[in-house]
């Protein structure tokens, strides 16, 4: 190795170069919600969607806004204490920061589509809808455990289920609107979110496969 290669090897993290590379690729895909024009979505919302469609989209965007706040918090407060290499720390903090973009994206959609006093009630919908509330409680149940090993294993399983199976199922339903010529701005936000979540699920899966984070006790 030449001097530059040695320095890169050291600052990227000798043990977890894959995580540094994943972080860099993920950062190259950075985006902001306000890059997406919503004018046509507003027209669709007011003139083309049924009341049932609007109710469905309100529920999904309300839950996604809150759920991604909690995903961000999970990366910061639950995962990072286990990360003891620079590459893994960078990857996880990058994932957490992108979840804030997702929060902003769904909130931006709601702000553009729902106006007046109704907006606040929609943002709080997940707190009063029985199905959304039960899902919220189920995804956070492990956080009440004092058993560190149980907490860690369920944290990983919940992340892979929440960021993988559950999110992608709802993404498919949302993208169906754009596929049929409706809500294309929202569809763009969802498409970029899917691209991000591919990296997030892959990164967490690699942490498990490579035994990086199966150190039951967090770093002090």
Protein language model features and the residues they cover:
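Non-heme di-metal
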Residues: 1-220
